């Protein structure tokens, strides 16, 4: 893959998450009854960062959990057409709560659909919202994010790579040309 550009550096990611945190607070008129659920891998640390920002702004903790979606078959080379839920972990009830799913990149929406199904199978929330760091287009399902860090229209030959300190040792979002 050939690097085209760096879309967000560590400071830009931090500013973006602060903005998303403010938008969540404003839209929900506070943070009462809000639960953040990160879509593993990179959605979970993003959800934790948003929760930390919200606590700093509002002075209230927000519960954070995760849903683990399997995107690959056992050989780890072929992406599944229909992602499946591996596990969901949230230590609080989501019944009648406002659940905000958090993911790094919104692409085909299949992962988000699987996460929505997992949340609905767990319990009946008041509603589900979606926050993403990057929306790159190419949706296959009628799902849109309520909170978007950055809209990046891409071609199908481009790859968006989100790197986070918690997993990759650095914070950045880069776009690559995939060489087929």
From Swiss-Prot:
What SUPFAM superfamilies does the record point to?
PRTase-like (SSF53271)
Q: Which InterPro entries match?
A: PRibTrfase_dom (IPR000836), PRTase-like (IPR029057), PyrR (IPR023050), PyrR_bifunctional (IPR050137)
Q: Which GO terms describe its molecular function?
A: RNA binding; uracil phosphoribosyltransferase activity
What's one GO BP annotation on this UniProt entry?
DNA-templated transcription termination
What keywords does the record list, in alphabetical order? Glycosyltransferase, RNA-binding, Transcription, Transcription regulation, Transcription termination, Transferase
User: Which residue numbers does the motif PRPP-binding cover?
Assistant: 99-111
**EC number of the protein:** 2.4.2.9
- Pfam family example for this protein? Pribosyltran
Q: Does the keyword section mention RNA-binding?
A: yes
Q: Tell me what reaction this enzyme catalyses.
A: UMP + diphosphate = 5-phospho-alpha-D-ribose 1-diphosphate + uracil
What job does this protein perform?
Regulates transcriptional attenuation of the pyrimidine nucleotide (pyr) operon by binding in a uridine-dependent manner to specific sites on pyr mRNA. This disrupts an antiterminator hairpin in the RNA and favors formation of a downstream transcription terminator, leading to a reduced expression of downstream genes.
NCBIfam families, alphabetically? PRK05205.1-4, PRK05205.1-5
Q: How would you summarize the oligomeric state and partners of this protein?
A: Homodimer and homohexamer; in equilibrium.
What protein family is recorded?
A: Belongs to the purine/pyrimidine phosphoribosyltransferase family. PyrR subfamily.
Mind telling me what this protein is named? Answer: Bifunctional protein PyrR
Upper classification of the source organism reads: Bacteria, Bacillati, Bacillota, Clostridia, Eubacteriales
